[in-house]
């Protein structure tokens, strides 16, 4: 079956080349988990890396939802992508195993370049995972990437406008998801085993700030099997590291101007970055300010 094409060839451990790839300090390092509603969730975890060919480790220095999600549902995933040309990508499925509040790994993380001179915060907990399956280290064609961005833009112009729908992206979300060259990554749950799959999707762009659309030509075998009406998450960021996560329903593929486009209905927008990670859209109700107190 087509669902198994790309995962059947994954290995049960990573190669030495892939292990070294995860040690690069400046790169995209994403963690894919499943939230309390059963939706995929994406978080940037800069400290994540392979400890051995079969184990991964990363450090926690802030409290966030993904740390709870990974403990509630041990099935999760990683994507490691270099930011220098040519882009190289590694995808991993893993099972969470345990945490440690004291370990050599924590000491190494806290004396690394990222935290060595920090006087306000340090990693206080290490998370460990066993590798279940891993892709080979693969190059991403910049030519194909740019072609997909072009196709998404052309196809988007053929989608019928609906000005009555409420915009769901704030000013930062509009910047992130309007500019096609901003890095974006989509996550969905593998229909075979429910592990999150993380796929680069730079070509995902906003349509009237209510939907995201993308051409599936690049990584077609991974994007084309996203189940219609399933929940997906899209992590987007600018080159200044302003980041948001969009979640919603994948409506399926439609042809516009002769171009096949995947369409995502935006239902939630999440800020995953400090100092205030949390839900942006839909907005939470704000209680009125209390200015008078009446004693009974």
Task: Map each language-model feature to its residues.
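Binding-site signature for planar aromatic cofactors or substrates
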Residues: 1-296
């Amino acid at each position: 079956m087509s669902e198994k094409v790309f995962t059947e060839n994954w290995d049960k451990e990573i190669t030495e080349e892939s292990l070294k790839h995860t040690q690069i300090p400046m790169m995209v390092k994403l963690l894919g988990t499943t939230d309390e509603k059963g939706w995929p969730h994406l978080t940037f975890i800069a400290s994540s890396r392979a400890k051995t060919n079969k184990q991964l480790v990363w450090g926690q220095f802030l409290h966030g939802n993904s740390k709870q999600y990974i403990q509630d549902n041990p099935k999760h995933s990683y994507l490691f992508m270099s930011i220098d040309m040519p882009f190289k990508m590694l995808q991993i499925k893993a099972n969470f195993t345990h945490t440690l509040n004291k370990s050599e790994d924590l000491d190494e993380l806290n004396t690394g370049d990222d935290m060595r001179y920090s006087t306000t915060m340090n990693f206080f907990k290490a998370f460990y995972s066993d590798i279940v399956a891993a892709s080979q280290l693969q190059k991403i064609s910049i030519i194909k990437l740019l072609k997909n961005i072009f196709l998404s833009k052309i196809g988007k112009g053929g989608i019928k406008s609906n000005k009555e729908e409420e915009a769901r992206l704030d000013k930062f979300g509009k910047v992130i998801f309007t500019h096609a060259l901003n890095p974006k990554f989509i996550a969905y749950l593998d229909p075979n085993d429910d592990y999150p799959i993380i796929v680069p999707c730079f070509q995902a762009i906003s349509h009237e700030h209510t939907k995201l659309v993308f051409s599936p030509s690049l990584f077609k075998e991974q994007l084309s099997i996203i189940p219609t009406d399933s929940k997906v998450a899209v992590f987007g960021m600018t080159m200044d590291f302003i980041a948001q996560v969009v979640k919603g329903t994948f409506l399926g593929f439609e042809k516009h101007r002769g171009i096949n486009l995947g369409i995502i209905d935006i239902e939630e927008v999440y800020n995953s970055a400090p100092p205030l990670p949390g839900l942006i859209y839909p907005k939470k109700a704000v209680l009125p300010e209390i200015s008078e107190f009446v004693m009974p």
